[in-house]
Amino acid sequence: MKQEKAYYHLPGSFEFYELYREFLPLFRTHREYFYDWCDIGSIYGAPADCVWGGGRAGFGEHDPKEVLALTREYGISARLTFSNSLLREEHLSDKKCNALCALFERENQVQSGIIVNSELLMDYLKTHYPQLYFVSSTTKVLTEFQQLRAETAREEFRYVVPDFRLNKAFGELDSLPQAQKDKVEFLCNECCWVGCRDRKCCYENVSRKNLGEACPEHICTAPGAEEGYRFSKAMENPGFIGIRDIQDVYMPMGFSNFKIEGRGLGSALVLEFLLYYMTKPEYQLHVREAIYLDNMLDLF
């Protein structure tokens, strides 16, 4: 069933609070700047020093109540990224993470969600915070289509983020029933090498760091790894999903959810994602001027 609206799930609710505090009013008051076929489905993230955290080592410092107040004001779902894959029973009693879940369950008028990897954690959360919904994390590295089919069939998950290497498996993706298509949340702008075999190890390294374990730094051996993340490089990735792909392929096929990564990047690059994926080209300069660009700004 063709979808009329694409929903973006945006990075850095804690990490880029100041950016969203400027961007969201603009998105509401100047809707003509932005594509009418897209909207914001959620903003995800986690504060620093959360043992349940995963995917990226969290560095967000903003007050959780202010984060929730901002998402509530604009009717956006807030998600906690609690995708640590190595949790043990003793970690479930962590006071900080439990307090965050209680807050997100209690105070957000739009239902909040948790991005999870650990079955142990999800079982605990279902019992203690039943009003939260669950997102199956891309850190599970679901690279086989049958894994994705099975995961989207699970009632526990409202959304499932597959590995980016399944993004272009169109024949198999189109075979999913509509109810399962509605759950698939594609990771659009991944820069990871398509031939990487260490992706799960990379995520596990982050999980160990968030648990406070002493561990060696994961060394990425992908071609060009020394350059770090570059959006131009991500656009050349075989799994990259651009705006034309979303409009011309995914939405007609019945898919409507798209995740933008970027929690570990800088706010300037995250703004470029918002410009590319959401903003009409003729208004991109207007958005830059509203957020940071003025006639006295020096770059050097």
Task: Describe the residue ranges of each PLM region.
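Active-site pocket-lining/capping segments in soluble small-molecule metabolic enzymes
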Residues: 1-151, 156-300
